[in-house]
Every structure is written in C-alpha cells, then in structure tokens.
UniProtKB/Swiss-Prot annotation:
Disulfides per UniProt: none
GO function term, MF aspect, one: S-adenosylmethionine:tRNA ribosyltransferase-isomerase activity
Reactions this protein catalyses: 7-aminomethyl-7-carbaguanosine(34) in tRNA + S-adenosyl-L-methionine = epoxyqueuosine(34) in tRNA + adenine + L-methionine + 2 H(+)
Name of this protein: S-adenosylmethionine:tRNA ribosyltransferase-isomerase
Pathway: tRNA modification; tRNA-queuosine biosynthesis
Amino acid sequence: MRLSDFDFHLPDAAIALRPAEPRDSARLLVVRPGEGLEDRIVRDLPDFLRPGDALVFNDTRVIPARLMGRRAGRETGGGDGSPVAVEATLHRRIAPDRWVAFMRPGKRLKEGDRIAFGHDQDRACQAGMLDATVIAKHEGGEIELAFDFAGVDLDLAVAAHGEMPLPPYIAAKRAEDDRDRADYQTVYAREDGSVAAPTAGLHFTSDLLERLKAGGVSLHFVTLHVGAGTFLPVKTDVVADHKMHAEFGEVPAAVADALNAARAAGGRIVCVGTTSLRLLESATGEDRIIKPFADETAIFITPGYRFRAADVLMTNFHLPKSTLFMLVSAFAGQATMKAAYEHAIAAGYRFYSYGDGSLLFRAATDENGSEQS
C-alpha cells in the first residue's frame, strides 16, 4: 500500500478549534459497512448499543507536556554555541528524572547541552527552575532529557510551567489557553501520563455515562499513555515502512476477565477511541482471548489486519495520510471510509481532536483479514 492510498482533500475550515458544548451535542456519523450512513449526535449513542455490550474507555490523563525554554550558550560561544529558544513536547517517561521528548530545533542540540525551562515570572515554580540536560539523541528524533528534579517534584514543576500540548493543526491557528486545561481532558481521566488526549472520550458527559449504564451497557477502563508520536506525519511512501513510536498501556486482569465474559455472553466490545482499540488488540491473542497487559505497544494497524478484540469503534475524524485514517480504513473498509469521509466533509462535520465523532461497525473479513464483498 502507498501513502497516497489514504489521501483526501480536507478543507482547512473543517478542523475544529474548540469542542462542542455540551460535549455530547457533537455530531455522530454512524457507519455500518454495506448499510449506508446515518447522521446523529453523540447523546444518541445508547440507541446503537444493547444490554450486555461492553464499552471500553482509556482513562489516561493529559499532562501539560509542552515546555518552552532556552538552551544555554556553550563555552565555544558564537554561532551555534549561542543561547537559543527551544520547545519540547514530552513524549515518554523512562525514569523518575528522565523523559524522552520531541524538541525544536532538535538539530541544534547536542549531548551535554543545558536547557532552562520555566524561567517565566508569571508561572513561578516554588521548587526552583525547571532545568534539564540533554543526555542522548535517539533514532526517530527523540531527545532524552535528565531533569534536575525527579518524581513528584518534577511532576509539580511540569504542571506549573507546562502548557497543554494541543495538536499542531490547532496550535498553528491559536494559542493554548485556560479553557484547554478542561476541554482537552475526559471527564473520567485519572491516570497521569499522556501528552495527547484520547479524543473520542472528550464527547462523554457524566449524564451520558449514567444513561449507558442504565441501558445495561457495562463500562470498563484501560490505560494507554498517548505519546507525542501520535502527532508525527507518516514520511514513508510505502506504508509498511513506517515505524510507530511505542506507548505504555495497561489492561488490568479484572477488565480482561470482564470483557471475555461479556463476549462469551453475546455482548460486543465497543472501543471508545483508537487508543483503547490499539491497546486491546495488543492484549488479545489469536484465540481472541483478552489477557492482562502491562507493557509498551507499537502496534500499527492497516488494511488487511485481522481484528481480534474490537467489534465497534467510536472515534473522531482523522487527518489525511495519518496512521489513524489507516486504522479506521482497516476496521470498516477502505471504500466505506472514503465514502464516509466524503459525506462528512460535504455535510460540514468538524474534524480532528476537538471535532465530531463517528461510530464504526467492523466490516466482515475473511480469515486473512481481507474485506468481504
């Protein structure tokens, strides 16, 4: 498959800069392969689920992982040794005092460079300044940082000085503000660690969750800490050559058991968001049994993949040539999703992290994962 197979024209105006209010008033495009499309709203979700279905959410919490700072001047002075402004988006924590991050301008950084973050009088940090040392530059553009703080002290410093890491397509149009601290967080978020929101979950309100439970749908929570790699574009023309960045996820034993029991009783597993789906697929064997999981995953789902866990997927509308558009094309079928996105664009659906949602029912596939006609 070529990257161009997943391209489509997306008008700039289609990208949402703010979420719908209230959250569950966002539009919802229901996609049943072979049965056409249906325009609804998110609060109609209970109409499409039945007693015994199991809804799976990602309960990760977004941290303010975007840090602004300056590289200190090197002793050599002048030229590339002069102080320079830098921006870091924390990606993955690897030790109490260490993160790997994506940084701009990363090419101007070297091992041993000192970075001074958080020297902002408007955001004073009681523990002191948030400084770090460049430890290593890794393959894929990641830069390893060792902070002067560790553990809880580092968490507090990042919370004091960091900004919410809005996706690039939104950040290019407006600055992050106080509203984003609430808007870019699900109502059920509880496990700190993500640098991007599991955006399908942003549509849920406490009232909608209660209505789902009242309808006999069980709610389950897993954790996948979304890394900054989710924002990176695919740069290879051959899709199979693309390498995903690893992210840490956990499926508790009790959740795995409950989901297996729900499926055995005839219920469907409904994933809220591609993060929940990717984690469950990583935790599920060829026998379609979901197992407890606590590890990194770099699963890359493209057309031809044979799904083991998910029966239904609720997800937002994704960007052209993105790994997530590849995933939904694998789930509901390439032709189906191209038609669905053409409809969504023509009908004025709002795209991307703060945009509207879609409810996708899995396409029938043969034993090789190929879509059946």
